[in-house]
Amino acid sequence: FLLCIIILRKVFSMATIKDYLNYYKDTSFNEYAFNELDNILFSELSYINWENIVSNYSSKIRLDHAINIFLGSLNDSTREGLSPFMKSNVENLKIIQNSNRYQNCFLANFRNQVDEEKQFGALCIYFNDGDVYVGFKGTDSTLVGWKEDLALAYTFPTLAQKDAINYLNEVIGWKDNTVYVGGHSKGGNLAMCAYMYSNNKVKRKVKKVFNNDGPGFRDTEYNSFQYKEMLGKLVMFVPEDSIVGVLLNSPPSFKVIKSTFNGPYEHDCNSWECFGSFFVEGRLGTLSKKFKERVDDIVNSYDDKKKEELVDTFFTILQKAGIKSFNNVSSIEWNQVLEIIKGITGIDNTTRDLFLDVFKSFINFQNKDKK
């Protein structure tokens, strides 16, 4: 029997979320309970632009109907402009749309706000006759989104964190039975923060908080009563070469997941390997450990004011070079390169090297998608 299990694990070790979708598409939540892979799928729904499809308030629309409208709104141009992660999410929508498992899911309370100071998105997914998954959107390609991510190292709460707390308190009502709160990337941090500072009525309804490769907190929040109280409900996943999920202070224990991708690209949760309704566990890689050490050295070397100055400098350099989004770094022109070189000349060596590493990874990621 043990040999059979080992063989099956070997055969199915390369399965991903898409395989899970296809295999369990005709299995209801009563037959096969909500699990960690459903959590990933629901967290991905918060990335979709449901503008003019899903209500900003409590009025609900069936998930399959919303998907049908959204897919009908896409054209070749909008599809081409999607990141690899979002292209995979759209492919998942096509399977979900025709899946009996998700036929009785409903969407409501859609939020998507981007301005000069913050990037915030959220969505409620209602399922299983009274249960709800509150999903928080992760970082998009905008500079403001990434700047707010880095602000986690010196500010609490950020504007997005404030919105997340208010949102969770607002959308959960007496009719909701079991509540799950989760998100991918920055959305995972927002999920933790929202639960930590939600009111007691909401906390009593929340069964689990999912952080899917999202960053942690500063020392102050990490050592707080609110954080320690949350740990009993927290489930955190990071891939073996995690970059985002190991930023700042992580919980004492988390699950490390194998991926079909390598390096920073493992952040794409569509690449995470699964076996049935469980992720295939691995070990934290050298890349992840070394990256965390470098970032921790910088974070611990400066006070909050200095860290804020460094982040402002980082994004001022990019803005002066005419870069408005990380989507266009692959087509950067020579005069923009010169502007960046000019901007980083006065930065200390350690910070400059980190800047170049991060910037290079974005260029490589965009080039990878074009091949």
Feature map (PLM): residue ranges:
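Alpha/beta hydrolase fold serine-hydrolase catalytic domain that processes acyl esters and thioesters
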Residues: 14-104, 108-132, 136-178, 199-371
